Amino acid sequence: TDDKNIFTQLLSGLSCLLIDGYDRAILIDCRTYPARGVSEPEKDKVLRGSRDGFVETLIFNTALIRRRIRDVNFTVEIMQTGESSHTDIAICYMKRRVDENLLKKIKDRIENLHVDALTMNQESLAECIFPHKWFNPFPKFRFSERPDTAAASILEGNIVILVDNSPACMILPSSVFDIIEEADDYYFPPVTGTYLRLSRMTVSFLTLFLTPVWLLFMQNQNWIPGWLEFVKLADDMYVPLIFQLLILEFAI
């Protein structure tokens, strides 16, 4: 009986059956979805594990996750946003494991969105529900194009958001340590996966702190300990500090 809902479903591809003398419309879902084949993501390949990835069709993406989680507690809630686009959004989570406060916060933010369309799919949604702040440059979520990564995150109690027309998902909450993880870590033995994560973490910290420490030592050379004397220039020659920093960045 809701004309707006009927028009929205018709524009989404459903068939509408009207019967003379009956004051309701019957919506029939007999549509097919134009979609590309399921293949491994180009930017998220693994040495071991499955070779499938998300596509641009929301119903296929939820099926790829459901294939891995056959549990009654696995929940998929469909929402819509966008005055013109009416973009479908799927919120996937596990009951009894998810943070209920975070889930309610995300659903409230999506329901209160007032946008014309999500032109850039999940990127537009991310900017709307989690706007960037200058004093917090770290991301609050991470993206993945792999259904096995999404399924593993859901089983850990995280929330996965799928947006129609997007071949990626948003996983939240997220921390700095989640960003340095890769899908291969789940397929290797625990010792190997832990070693790989620690290696990436060490390189990340060195990249972040080595340059300012170098600058501090070059401006205060009397602070350099004896076992680091080799970093000093052996000959009395002038090398601009900017070139030293550039060489250090290339070395890292």
Where do the PLM segments sit?
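Cytosolic regulatory modules rich in charged/polar residues
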Residues: 1-244
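Hydrophobic, membrane-inserted alpha-helices
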Residues: 248-252
